[in-house]
Amino acid sequence: LGRATKGSASAMLAKVYLTREDYQNVVKETSEVMQMGYKLWDNYADNFDVEKENGQESIFEIQFKRNTPGVSGSNYNGYYRPPFVNINGWVGYGDDPVTRNHYECYEEGDLRRDINVRLYTKEEYPNMSSNYEFPCYVNKFQDPSPLAVRSQGGENNYPILRYSDVYLMRAEALNAINTSDAEAYECLNVIRRRAFGLNMNEASAIDIKPGLSKEDFL
């Protein structure tokens, strides 16, 4: 676990090709990864479940383990929480707050918002000492274990590449080659459907339709 694989090499190479606008090679590399047995989780949140790490959607992730010689635990519980005192044993650093714009950009019904981001309020945590007007922080990398204190106590791995990344890279490359490519839209819509808690393999009302302008898409 935690070692680079042929799948992670091909997926990373696809990402490099994408930055170089070498779309044909993006399609080539993503095609190879799609033949390697990876699968998307039906539930988006499973990607960040400590009990499901290195699972079917994982291509490469940084490994963390607490109280293990030679292996570091994560300290995301500190980084991604506001500075407050004695809240269920957690103490946050107050680093890396999420912007209001990011929090509000999720569409209504998109389940990813409350998985990815948490809004901390004075009403919920009256002893929170934060000067942030909008104290939102990354939520998906929190380890819920009471043993996961802020200093390297978390066991939640950090995903670098997921199979969903392959879908999205492929969608972008296919669309760049041919803006009416049906597969490009299907790759994108598979990810969108899951985000809204729908069957990934069935057309839905939230699907992105061909022919949208950039402004409409955004």
Residue spans for each PLM region:
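Acidic/polar-rich alpha-helix caps and helix-coil junctions
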Residues: 1-73, 111-218
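Active-site core of glycosidic bond-cleaving carbohydrate-active enzymes
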Residues: 61, 88-118
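N-terminal hydrophobic or amphipathic segments with adjacent small-residue motifs
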Residues: 55, 83-86, 104
